[in-house]
Curated annotation (Swiss-Prot):
Tissue expression notes: Red blood cells.
Any one GO cellular component localisation term in the record: hemoglobin complex
Official protein name in the record: Hemoglobin subunit beta
UniProt-annotated binding residues for heme b: 63, 92
Domain of life: Eukaryota
Keywords recorded for this protein, A-Z: Acetylation, Heme, Iron, Metal-binding, Oxygen transport, Phosphoprotein, S-nitrosylation, Transport
Originating organism: Peromyscus californicus
């Protein structure tokens, strides 16, 4: 993904204001609520029967944190997202068989949750920069798909 130095500074600066453990659970939970067909990948997570069950589910929160920890690592390597996410791409392609479109959906949820959490600090420029990043991450995660 091509980001200017200003966009990189904006993305990493704002990232320091969020708590990935909270943000990840919120974004993943919203994905599972808004796009219920994505729940099929999380059968082992227990009660996914309603929005409140999903949003309060400790396994959803834990996996959301794991996702955001990986995203945080990606922010350290914005010039090499494909390399950074190569093993996760392979896992999601070959073992989990996740539809790569889901990566885009989760990225959009992440941007929405960031906008909500950061309020006025999440300027149009910040949104544009984050949209580039989540698109780049989604592309990197889809890289190993045939």
């Amino acid at each position: 993904v091509h980001l200017t130095d200003a966009e990189k500074a904006l993305v990493t600066g704002l990232w320091g204001k969020v708590k990935p453990d909270e943000l990840g659970g919120e974004a993943l939970g919203r994905l599972l609520v808004g796009y219920p067909w994505t729940q099929r990948f999380f059968d082992s997570f227990g009660d996914l029967s309603s929005a409140s069950a999903l949003m309060g589910n400790p396994k959803v929160k834990a996996h959301g944190k794991k996702v955001l920890d990986s995203f945080s690592e990606g922010l350290k390597h914005l010039d090499n997202l494909k390399g950074t996410f190569a093993s996760l791409s392979e896992l999601h392609c070959d073992k989990l068989h996740v539809d790569p479109e889901n990566f885009k959906l989760l990225g959009n949820m992440l941007v929405l949750v960031l906008a909500h959490l950061l309020g006025k600090d999440f300027t149009p420029a910040a949104q544009a920069a984050y949209q580039k990043v989540v698109a780049g991450v989604a592309t990197a995660l889809a890289h190993k798909y045939h």
